[in-house]
Amino acid sequence: MASTFNPRECKLSKKEGQNYGFFLRIEKDTDGHLVRVIEEGSPAEKAGLLDGDRVLRINGVFVDKEEHAQVVDLVRKSGNSVTLLVLDGDSYEKAVKHQVDLKELDQSPREPALNEKKPDLGMNGGVETCAQPRLCYLVKEGNSFGFSLKTIQGKKGVFLTDITPQGVAMKAGVLADDHLIEVNGENVENASHEEVVEKVTKSGSRIMFLLVDKETARCHSEQKTPFKRETASLKLLPHQPRVVVIKKGSNGYGFYLRAGPEQKGQIIKDIEPGSPAEAAGLKNNDLVVAVNGESVEALDHDGVVEMIRNGGDQTTLLVLDKEADRIYSLARFSPLLYCQSQELPNGSVKEAPAPISAPLEAPGSATTEDVGDHKPKLCRLIKEDDSYGFHLNAIRGQPGSFVKEVQQGGPADKAGLENEDIIIEVNGENVQDEPYDRVVERIKSSGEHVTLLVCGKVAYSYFQAKKIPILSSLADPLVAGPDAKGETEHDSAESTKDSSHPARDRTLSAASHSSSNSEDTVM
């Protein structure tokens, strides 16, 4: 029965600030997410969308049974291009009536017709260049990673399917029908479905996948070339190695190097305030992986010290914090591969931004010195006298909230919050597009302490202009204080949600309950 239904793949592209030119809606007594009111000459019309079409998949993710608000959100967050798999209205209603599994429609790649040419994408000297495999790091939320595993008759390997919209897998960069190459650094290309399921189950709450999308898998299959793990893209990993270039001062570099009793290798300790090490971005408990471009993982303490001394008045260190070390160890990848994939400017600290729900290229025009001058801030506030010591303000009818009237000496002031700081995250959840009341509710429900990711106006404008997502990984990590209740230096709230939103003009009005154009709450 399923073979009698023919969904259509419609690829829509629009310019910045333009609409796709159609309405996506639900209607009473009508199943599915409907396409309506297609504008003449719009991207929707050009892509072949028809009135009454039902949307089955968005960018490969099955959405027919999802909440309508989530489906709309997926389209909006796709940027300036989106791929929709749709079924015409009559066929959809027949499929529902006959209880056809809509997930199974158009699951296998369509073969080109005899008179149809394959697209010449990624061609280099007449040979198609296959895209990179990619590492995806998943941390379970609740009891689910947000995907299912499947095998396809006649195809070798195990594939990922049923990707939950805005779930763990999607946020980590997993795509529908991805071919699974490795689980936690172990190749599973020849493993059975049951063996892969067992490996995933035994992984616990954290797992690392090496994946290729279906087009990349097809490319390698046609060229009969194996996947090379050393070519994998690392940009989706939430914590990355850092390259730190330090120039020696009059009193040396300003840090101690120690062999870690609990952590392997040589660990950075006791960084002196105001020292060259602190200024260069070195952190306590960083693990040293390479010195001046050479791996030191196999050297003892004296050997690493000697290499640093041999650098003269300047040394370059490749370091990992504890979480980055944990991630790369799980993947069984050398951090040196990260260096090989980066173009590092001289005399800078390179910190890669964390991923969002889809791969993002770092803007080529932004130098690391620029980013270092425009950092968001992680602020952990401990309530005093039932107050956080600041007002929250917003422009009525517009998304986004910002800080006003920070009380001197209050919790907000102590945590580093400043007037007109823009709220990006509350306890790791991105709130840039949330209504004012919802942000207030999140902060109030936090109890005695709350962690905010905020950005000053100048830094916010910089990130928006450069199209750099504002993520907590760009901020300096929180340091555990006497009231931190056992949290470690690296226990900071991380968000994988897309926060690359267009800059919004704001009139930063004074906090007032009676203002006609703003909303304000004492926190």
Swiss-Prot record:
Tissue and organ distribution: Highly expressed in small intestine and kidney, slightly in the liver. Expression was up-regulated when fed on a low inorganic phosphate diet.
Annotated positions of the Phosphoserine modification: 108, 148, 192, 250, 334, 348, 492, 495, 512, 514-516, 518
One cellular component term from this protein's GO annotations in UniProt: microvillus membrane
GO process annotations (BP): carnitine transmembrane transport; carnitine transport; cholesterol transport; in utero embryonic development; intracellular transport; positive regulation of cation transmembrane transport; positive regulation of protein localization to membrane; positive regulation of protein targeting to membrane
Record field: compositional bias (Low complexity): 509-523
Modification Phosphothreonine, positions: 451, 488, 507
Keywords, sorted A to Z: Cell membrane, Membrane, Phosphoprotein, Repeat
Compartments reported by the entry: Membrane; Cell membrane
UniProt xrefs under CDD domains: PDZ_NHERF-like (cd06768)
Main location per the UniProt record: membrane
Annotated PDZ domain residues: 9-90, 128-215, 243-323, 378-458
GO molecular function, one term: signaling receptor binding
Bias (Basic and acidic residues): 484-507
Region (Disordered): 479-523
Topological category with respect to the lipid bilayer: Peripheral membrane protein
Annotated SMART domains: PDZ (SM00228)
Family to which the UniProt record says this protein belongs: Belongs to the NHER family.
Oligomer status and interactors: Interacts with PDZK1IP1 and ABCC2. Binds to the C-terminal region of SLC26A3. Interacts (via PDZ domains 1 and 3) with SCARB1 (C-terminal domain). Forms a heterodimeric complex with NHERF1. Interacts with AKAP2, BCR, CFTR, SLCO1A1, SLC22A12, SLC22A4, SLC22A5, NHERF2 and SLC17A1. Component of a complex, composed of PDZK1, SYNGAP1, KLHL17 and NMDA receptors. Interacts (via PDZ1 domain) directly with KLHL17; the interaction is important for integrity of actin cytoskeleton structures in neurons. Interacts (via C-terminal PDZ domain) with SLC26A6 (via C-terminal domain).
Reported function: A scaffold protein that connects plasma membrane proteins and regulatory components, regulating their surface expression in epithelial cells apical domains. May be involved in the coordination of a diverse range of regulatory processes for ion transport and second messenger cascades. In complex with NHERF1, may cluster proteins that are functionally dependent in a mutual fashion and modulate the trafficking and the activity of the associated membrane proteins. May play a role in the cellular mechanisms associated with multidrug resistance through its interaction with ABCC2 and PDZK1IP1.
UniProt note: domains: The PDZ 2 and 3 domains seem to be involved in the interaction with SLC26A3. Interaction with the C-terminus of CFTR could be mediated through independent binding of 1, 3 and 4 domains.
Entry protein name: Na(+)/H(+) exchange regulatory cofactor NHE-RF3
